[in-house]
From Swiss-Prot:
TM ranges: 67-87
Superkingdom in the source lineage: Bacteria
This protein's name: Uncharacterized protein slr0272
Example of a GO cellular component annotation carried by this entry: membrane
Bilayer topology term: Single-pass membrane protein
Keywords carried by this UniProt record: Membrane, Transmembrane, Transmembrane helix
Location of the protein in the cell: Membrane
Major place of residence: membrane
Length: 325
């Protein structure tokens, strides 16, 4: 129920909720009684939220969000995979893209002609022709082994060696060394023939696979090539130089000497498989010392040499005398 309100100036009863007196116009003082409300009771307010002291909250280490490493790893895989795909399958497009984004040098390139290279010339180089000739090879240590005559000839691009009835081909020239092989009882045996710098000595090396190597040293037999046969050299009519005889002239004189001519003709008739050879073994200002020997190549026997005799040829007069070494 509402309490009546009166004007404090004139005592007139005022209507509820007026601000001025209707009789005298004085302002009406508000009463302290709160207005009444009709309706259902209000629900109680929720309790205020708890307050925390910031200083008392326990500190925790800041952790790394788990999706950040995953995102970085995924991005790296995508970028690397894209670069690989561009390089492996789209190389032209990749190059064009690089040309567009990278700065290019607009200056014209300098064109230089290549400098020709000249291969150095080896003064000691040898050819196949340097091996051609007749060689006397000492087998084993001096005084212990035998002697063998190697006749080397050039057939096409292959050096052919005939020794003691055997024939060996050397198709490869490696530096100063000939390389070939023979087959004995189904076993391949490599053989090398190396020429020295003066081209007057060879080293023959046999490399059996299941035994020790064998080495022989050979000397070139001088004055044998292109000599006339004994039948054409019996007249003793030779043109001798006024000063000294050359090696060839000394050998021709000895071939025409009756004793040597008969011996060479007899070997040719009785043992055509053998060879008669003359070798200048020593040269002095006065004379040549020449050895006459036979290369024996009888079938079924090991090859060897047999000395027929030693002879001196005077370099001034051309006189031939027998020598005892």
């Amino acid at each position: 129920m509402t309490t009546p309100v009166f004007c404090t100036n004139c005592g007139n009863r005022l209507s509820p909720q007026v601000r001025f007196c209707e009789s005298c116009g004085c302002p009406v003082a508000l009463t302290s009684e709160p207005p009444s409300f009709s309706g259902p009771p209000l629900s109680p307010l929720p309790p205020p939220p708890p307050t925390f002291n910031v200083d008392e909250v326990p500190s925790h280490k800041r952790g790394v969000t788990p999706w950040i490493p995953f995102f970085l790893l995924f991005s790296s895989v995508v970028v690397l995979g894209g670069l690989w795909w561009l390089g492996a399958f789209n190389l032209p497009q990749w190059n064009q893209w690089l040309v567009k984004i990278l700065p290019t040098n607009t200056s014209s390139p300098v064109v230089t002609s290549p400098t020709p290279t000249v291969a150095p010339v080896d003064a000691n180089a040898v050819s196949l022709e340097d091996f051609v000739g007749v060689w006397m090879v000492m087998e084993g240590a001096p005084g212990e082994g035998g002697e063998a005559i190697f006749t080397m000839s050039l057939e096409g691009n292959v050096i052919v060696v005939e020794a003691e009835g055997d024939r060996v081909e050397f198709p490869t020239l490696n530096g100063r060394k000939l390389e070939g092989s023979v087959v004995e009882d189904g076993v391949t045996i490599p053989i090398t023939v190396e020429l020295n710098q003066n081209k007057d000595q060879i080293i023959v090396t046999v490399l059996p696979p299941n035994s020790e190597l064998q080495v022989g040293v050979g000397q070139r037999v001088k004055g044998i090539d292109d000599l006339d046969s004994p039948s054409n050299s019996r007249d003793n009519s030779l043109n001798i130089d006024e000063n000294v005889l050359t090696e060839r002239q000394a050998l021709e004189l000895l071939i025409a000497w009756p004793e040597i001519a008969d011996w060479m003709q007899r070997v040719q008739q009785e043992a055509p498989q053998n060879q008669t050879l003359l070798e200048i073994v020593e040269t002095t200002p006065q004379q040549y010392l020449i050895r006459a020997y036979e290369s024996v190549n009888n079938p079924g026997e090991p090859g060897h040499t047999a000395t027929f005799g030693w002879y001196n040829v005077d370099r001034q007069t051309g006189e031939v005398t027998q020598s005892i070494p």
